[in-house]
């Protein structure tokens, strides 16, 4: 029995050594990923002339294997409250899949071209800034009351609703009303480069999940006009063409998805 003691000690030593090596390797990989994300965030900030570092994530494990192969599985970039000449503030998002780093380093220089297998690009305007633009200070934007889409509640993988029948609720003071009303609004894009967002009010909504406030017939046209507008300058990160527009939560989102594109960090912010 006593002869087993040295064997047990040897096994314990081997296991402890292996665990230490594994923990060290994971720690090294994690540290390298954090440094790469920090440098990428700083490079995006400088390239896009942002006021602060955007949120950046390089996804996939192990990181070092991806860096050595000059190929990242996925990168997420999110910049909130970016100055926008038309609406005041907007958020910019991009998700890059299958990124070829052949022409750049694992730290990704701002001007280095990256071949991206799939790129999802979004510009997001919250209810507050849409309302300020429309001069409806208490505006709340919501997805259509009836969605027949997937489990995310939207028609896209990122959970964006359809573009028809969004619910806009607010007080149309310019029309002479002092109570909140709910209006059905359709979204569309126009212009040669599809960067003008058109909001078209189509009718008053009453009943559950609305302000449930009718509008007098003599005020209807004015209210619908007040809830209709055009918002120019909606350029998506990396200049991707829009493919959908809708709501998520209380935000309006324009999204573009492209396959097989070459971009660099200088193109993240377009306006």
Which residues does each predicted region cover?
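N-terminal beta-strand/beta-hairpin edge segment
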Residues: 51-131, 135-174
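Short secondary-structure junctions
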Residues: 47-54, 136, 234-239
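Hydrophobic membrane/lipid-contacting segments
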Residues: 97-102, 156-218, 252, 257-259
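Hydrophobic membrane-targeting and insertion signals
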Residues: 1-68, 84-86, 266-271
């Amino acid at each position: 029995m006593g002869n087993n003691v040295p064997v047990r000690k040897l096994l314990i030593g081997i296991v402890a050594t292996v665990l230490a090596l594994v923990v060290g390797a994971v720690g090294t990989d994690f540290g390298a990923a954090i440094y790469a994300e920090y440098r990428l965030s700083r490079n995006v900030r400088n390239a896009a002339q942002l006021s602060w570092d955007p949120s950046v994530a390089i996804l996939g494990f192990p990181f070092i294997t991806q860096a050595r192969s000059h190929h990242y599985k996925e990168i997420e970039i999110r910049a909130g409250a970016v100055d926008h000449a038309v609406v005041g503030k907007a958020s910019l998002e991009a998700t890059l899949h299958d990124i070829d780093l052949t022409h750049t380093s694992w730290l990704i220089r701002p001007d280095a071209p990256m071949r991206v297998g799939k790129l999802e690009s979004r510009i997001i305007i919250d209810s507050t800034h849409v309302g300020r633009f429309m001069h409806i200070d208490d505006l709340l934007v919501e997805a259509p009351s009836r969605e027949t889409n997937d489990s995310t509640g939207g028609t896209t993988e990122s959970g964006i609703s359809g573009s028809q029948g969004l619910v806009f609720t607010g007080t149309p003071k310019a029309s002479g009303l002092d109570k909140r009303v709910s209006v059905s609004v359709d979204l569309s894009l126009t212009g040669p480069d599809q960067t003008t967002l058109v909001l078209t009010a189509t009718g008053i909504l009453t009943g559950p999940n609305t302000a449930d406030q009718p509008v007098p017939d003599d005020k209807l046209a004015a209210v619908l006009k007040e809830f209709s507008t055009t918002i120019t300058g909606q350029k998506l990160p990396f200049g991707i063409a829009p493919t959908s527009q809708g709501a998520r939560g209380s935000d309006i989102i324009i999204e573009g998805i492209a396959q097989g594109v070459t971009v660099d960090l200088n193109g993240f912010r377009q306006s």
